[in-house]
Amino acid sequence: MNKFKFFILFAIVFSSCKKEVKNNNIFLGGQIINPSSSYLILHKNNSTIDCLLLDSNNFFQKKFNNLESGFYKIEHIPEYQTIFLEPGDSLWLRVNAVEFKQSIVYSGKGSSKNNFLIQNDISNEIENEFLSSKYSLKNNLFSNIIDSLVLQKKNQWKNMDSINNLSKYAQKVTMAAYVYNYANLRERYALLRGANWSQSEKKKYFKYRYFLNFEETDLSSFDPYIDYMLNYLSEQSLDSSNYYFKTKQNTDFNIKRLKIVENNIIGRELKNNLARAIAYDEILNFDNHSQHENFLQYYFAVNSNTRFLGEVLSLHNDIKKMNVGSILPRIFIQNSKLDTISSNEILNKKPTIIYFWSQTQMNQYRKTLKVIEKIKIKKPEYRFVGISIQPLNKMVLKVNKMLGLDKKDQYAIINFENASKKWIITLLNKSIILDSNGNIVNGFANIFDLELLNEL
């Protein structure tokens, strides 16, 4: 992937970092190029900390007096990125929303650890593409490749650590970023290829587990660690006679994962985070909806976080409202005149397909429009309504006009958090099929599904 190289901004506020005075505050600021909205949100542990507004030049900044050391997420719809903050940090970031992850550059106190994390994340994506062709190798050859990559990252980490005065916590986090990523790849290989391994093969292959910790309370909300633990739980839950990609679709498989969490994970926060992730995997598998009441009984027994419980139950109930025959839940949207209207107003007594797109993912948008054109030829009686997940502006309206789209069929979401909850918008390839009365035919269709035409 191409990387944008930005000129790093240094603000006057950083001059205060030169003083030999202990500072327990955390400063966070920066600039977003080509923003998709007028704000970004700071999260911790899946809870909103603050909403940071962009000024007329798309800058934001705020000093926090009581933030703890740990992992935070900055969200600029539809993108987000994890950052690691500690008291005394004065972190600036610059990002182009069109190439969000690839363009992030940090500067200021606390930048070295975060630049290491983002570059590690980007290189992991490149390596994963390379490794996708290596899963056919024997396990010893695959392990050798991973060992080589681990050594390379370890040397990069040593170099970074040697020129920065990192805290013990920051050292642990930056090291864990690559250690658990590669451990995760090993677990994934085992899920795909390890069904018929002998005990001696398993013992040799899984020896890396002896160096890992399954009770990392400091990493309980760190994505590389959680991703590893989820694949580890999957490997532990998979019977030798089962095929992973088929088995993981079953509710019983996720119940088994919950039971392993309950019986083997002691730390409450880690246990709740793992259970929440498993619950989302299951509840968002719409084909299993009839079995979710049973699944939730097991989830209730494992989870002790009331907020997570409310989230999962709310998601389950919102999915019910999107079932076949239901009336599409009402949200407020923006029309091409930039007026706010009710979503009920887009209905016009014609069967309708609603599709979604993002102003920061134009390649996806073009692919979607090509699919829509093909469907139009075979199903001319349908109306096709495009909804941007960010509010419209004059530039977007101009682009849609250049693409030959009827502005009467183009709308935008005003409050993504509310809309994504009510309409269960988790992926941009989601589409909603309505009959001529506005009732739901399929609330969870995939616009790129080859079987979509058969539903119309």
Question: What kind of region is each of these model predictions?
Answer:
Residues 1-27, 443:
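Bacterial Sec-dependent N-terminal signal peptides
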Residues 17-173, 186:
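A non-transmembrane, solvent-exposed segment enriched in polar/low-complexity residues
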Residues 253-324:
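N-terminal targeting signals for export/organelle localization
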Residues 309-344, 406-407:
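N-terminal "domain-start" segment that seeds a small globular fold
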Residues 341-372, 385:
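Short active-site neighborhood of thiol/selenol oxidoreductases, capturing the structured segment around
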Residues 363-403, 415-419:
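Structural microenvironment flanking redox-active thiols in thiol-disulfide oxidoreductases
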Residues 400-436:
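Short, internal strand/loop/helix patches
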Residues 427-430, 436-456:
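Non-catalytic, surface beta->alpha helical segment in thiol-disulfide oxidoreductase systems
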